[in-house]
């Protein structure tokens, strides 16, 4: 695919793969199971964060040396995740010089039925800063 | 307004045993969090550094996801020690402030506290540090809902 994102080791630990979009897919498996037959909330939060960071990195792909650091995240859990693939995608609400505000969503068979969402604030570090903040 | 349940004395709920059980299975098992200590309304767990939990290959800093999972588990256990028994619950929301990056190779300690308990909702907060509780790496706040209370 060639596109970002190169997943960090933790992304591989969760079994996440990236598709066009970017769309993030986390298959069900023992290592992401919480209570029996359900996806663990921590794994869902991890998927949402990886989708949020990955989508910001995708938006920054033309800027060599740019990277981000998480400031905070708020995760809402809306439905239990069942024994099937979980998908996640993110929207960059604002990409400033220093701060990115991102919203990420996770669902399973029906994109309209969210199982979790996250709002994330990230610090953006650009190689050469300039322009409006 | 709902009356909060007062903190109960330590009873049947054994966080040592439950941590061992929970950590033997699934995502918590893969993370491998260990029991450290507990009080009447708090539980402390430890997460050892592992290369596969790294979030940034360049800096070798632990990803934020495992810190959320650790705090979710520590705060969940805190609700049960405060209640004095296990009660099925679901996480409604969890907010994490990443105060600074954890130092690579260091074990992360997660301190979870249940500061208010009603019949249906548990309010929790906590922090994580990598050696010095006065210099935390993360602060969390969240709520749980009891799933089997009418």
PLM region spans:
Chain B
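Catalytic strand-loop segment that frames the active site of acyl-thioester-processing enzymes
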Residues: 32-62
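Short, solvent-exposed helix-to-loop capping segments enriched in aromatics
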Residues: 15-25, 77-86
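A generic structural signal for short beta-strands and their flanking turns/coil linkers
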Residues: 29-31, 41-43, 88-94, 106, ...
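HotDog/MaoC-like acyl-thioester-processing domains
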Residues: 2-12, 102-109, 113-150
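N-terminal structural module
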Residues: 18-40
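Compact, glycine-rich, soluble single-domain proteins
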Residues: 58-76
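Hydrophobic beta-strand-centered segment that forms part of the acyl-chain substrate-binding groove
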Residues: 76-109, 114
């Amino acid at each position: 695919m060639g596109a970002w994102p190169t997943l960090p080791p933790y992304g591989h630990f969760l079994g996440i793969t990236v598709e066009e979009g970017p769309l993030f897919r986390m298959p069900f498996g023992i290592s992401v199971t919480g209570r029996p037959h359900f996806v663990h909330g921590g794994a869902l939060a991890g998927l949402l964060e990886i989708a949020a960071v990955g989508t910001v990195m995708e938006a920054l792909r033309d800027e060599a040396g740019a990277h981000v650091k998480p400031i905070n995240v708020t995760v809402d859990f809306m439905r239990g995740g069942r024994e099937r693939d979980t998908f996640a995608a993110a929207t960059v609400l604002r990409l400033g010089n220093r701060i990115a505000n991102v919203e990420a969503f996770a669902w399973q068979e029906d994109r309209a039925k969210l199982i979790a969402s996250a709002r994330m604030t990230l610090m953006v570090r650009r190689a050469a800063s300039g322009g409006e903040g | 307004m709902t009356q909060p349940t007062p903190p109960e004395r330590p009873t049947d709920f054994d966080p040592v045993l439950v941590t061992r059980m929970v950590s033997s299975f699934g995502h918590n098992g893969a993370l491998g969090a260990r029991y450290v200590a507990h009080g009447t309304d708090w539980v402390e767990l430890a997460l050892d550094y592992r290369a596969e939990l790294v979030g940034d290959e360049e800096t070798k800093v632990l990803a934020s996801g495992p810190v959320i999972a650790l705090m979710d588990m520590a705060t969940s256990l805190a609700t049960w020690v405060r209640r004095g028994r296990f009660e099925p619950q679901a996480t409604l929301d969890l907010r994490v402030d990443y105060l600074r990056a954890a130092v690579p190779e260091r074990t992360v300690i997660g301190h979870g506290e249940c500061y208010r308990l009603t019949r249906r909702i548990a309010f929790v907060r906590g922090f994580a540090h990598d050696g010095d509780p006065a210099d935390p790496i993360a602060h969390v706040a969240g709520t749980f809902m009891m799933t089997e209370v009418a």
